[in-house]
């Protein structure tokens, strides 16, 4: 019998993301916005778009649309790097701080609800298995 593990994991990611999007809708943000803001917030100040894209694990053109949306909402600013006029530096605005706090609260409470009824040992086991799968895939990609 063929394993459906890959499909099962993909479906889990889809429904998890859909729930996050639903919960963030009152803030007029999406899971993609949160991931971007979260990474900008945790990285050293004024990262370039290239550095941010690498940290998130996406291509730079995919990131630009999200950054445009966050800039329109007044949550980030972008300015040209003094050393490299082609590069843009990203900075959170003062307005973003309370929003990031709200979003983090939504994400944290949603995560707790999703993981409800699952023991810490089970979560640790699952995380370990996911790490193993990721390492196997990375190793296969490098061949």
Curated annotation (Swiss-Prot):
GO biological process, one term: response to stress
Short name of one Pfam family: MarR
Domain of life per record: Bacteria
Transmembrane segments: none
Keywords: Activator, DNA-binding, Repressor, Transcription, Transcription regulation, Virulence
PROSITE patterns: HTH_MARR_1, HTH_MARR_2
Span of domain HTH marR-type: 2-135
SMART domains with a match to the protein in the record: HTH_MARR
Gene3D superfamilies in alphabetical order: Winged helix-like DNA-binding domain superfamily/Winged helix DNA-binding domain
Signal sequence, start to end: none
Repressor is among the record's keywords: yes
Protein task: Transcription regulator that can specifically activate or repress expression of target genes. Required for expression of the virulence gene inv. Important for the regulation of genes that influence the early stages of infection that occur in the Peyer plaque.
Quaternary state and interactors: Homodimer.
Entries under HAMAP family matching the protein: HTH_type_SlyA
NCBIfam families reported for this sequence: PRK03573.1
Protein name: Transcriptional regulator SlyA
High-level lineage: Bacteria, Pseudomonadati, Pseudomonadota, Gammaproteobacteria, Enterobacterales
């Amino acid at each position: 019998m063929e394993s459906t593990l890959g499909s099962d994991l993909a479906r889990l990611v889809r429904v998890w993301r859909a729930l996050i999007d639903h919960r963030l809708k009152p803030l007029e943000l999406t899971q993609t916005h949160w991931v971007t803001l979260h990474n900008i917030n945790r990285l050293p100040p004024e990262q370039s778009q290239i550095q941010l894209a690498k940290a998130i694990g996406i291509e730079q053109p995919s990131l630009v649309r999200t950054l445009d949306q966050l800039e329109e909402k007044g949550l980030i600013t972008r300015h040209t790097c003094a050393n490299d006029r082609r590069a843009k530096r990203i900075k959170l605005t003062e307005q973003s701080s309370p929003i990031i706090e709200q979003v983090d609260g939504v994400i944290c409470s949603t995560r707790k609800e999703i993981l409800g009824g699952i023991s810490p040992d089970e979560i640790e086991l699952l995380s370990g298995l996911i790490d193993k799968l990721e390492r196997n895939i990375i190793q296969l990609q490098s061949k």
